[in-house]
Amino acid sequence: MVGLSRLTGGGLLLVLALLPLALDGKPLEEAPTAPSRIIPFSRPVRKESQAVLDPMVHPERPAGSGDDGDLSRLEGLAKEALGDGCFGLKLDRIGTSSGLGCNPKRPDPAPTALARIIPFSRPVRKESRAALDRMQHPG
């Protein structure tokens, strides 16, 4: 066997390229594609699942052609489960209690620092009151 140090100058690539020929005497065949390997071993598909999978497998098929009864029935069930909210009944209940839903009820914004401090400050002269009013209500 040839030493590894002799293969470093590009000889290693040559050995790797010739390796399939040395093993069989013929080059390797192309490997089968992923779908052809997987599809024969997959289990049969039920009618309900087939109605959903058909548009994905055959996108060129128009939506209104053929047997769309199962698909429309499934769509109807899915729409019933949603309820009136955005995400479905359970999530909408969580959203309304946590305030994270589609239309959360937001409390009034917190008062500014001036509005919290001023009522507790000492009485103010007329000149200062005018300045404070301008700060509280600009514009």
UniProtKB/Swiss-Prot annotation:
Which residues are assigned to the propeptide feature? 26-75, 117-139
User: Disulfide pairs?
Assistant: C86-C102
Q: Organism's domain of life?
A: Eukaryota
Tell me the compartments it is located in. Secreted
- Tissue-wise expression: Expressed by the venom gland.
Keywords attached to this Swiss-Prot or TrEMBL record, sorted alphabetically, are:
Disulfide bond, Hypotensive agent, Secreted, Signal, Toxin, Vasoactive, Vasodilator
Gene Ontology biological process terms in this record: regulation of blood pressure; vasodilation
> Known Pfam families for this protein?
ANP
Principal localization? Answer: secreted
Q: Which residues form the signal peptide?
A: 1-25
The record's listing under InterPro entries reads: C_natriurtcpep (IPR002406), Natr_peptide (IPR000663), Natr_peptide_CS (IPR030480)
Q: Name one GO cellular component term.
A: extracellular region
Instruction: Tell me one GO molecular function of this protein.
Output: hormone activity
The family this protein is said to belong to: Belongs to the natriuretic peptide family.
What does this gene product do?
A: Natriuretic peptide that dose-dependently induces the rapid relaxation of rat aortic strips phenylephrine-precontracted. Acts by stimulating cGMP production in a dose-dependent manner (by probably activating NPR1 and/or NPR2). May also show potent hypotensive effects.
What's the protein here called? Natriuretic peptide Mf-NP
**Organism expressing this protein natively:** Micrurus fulvius
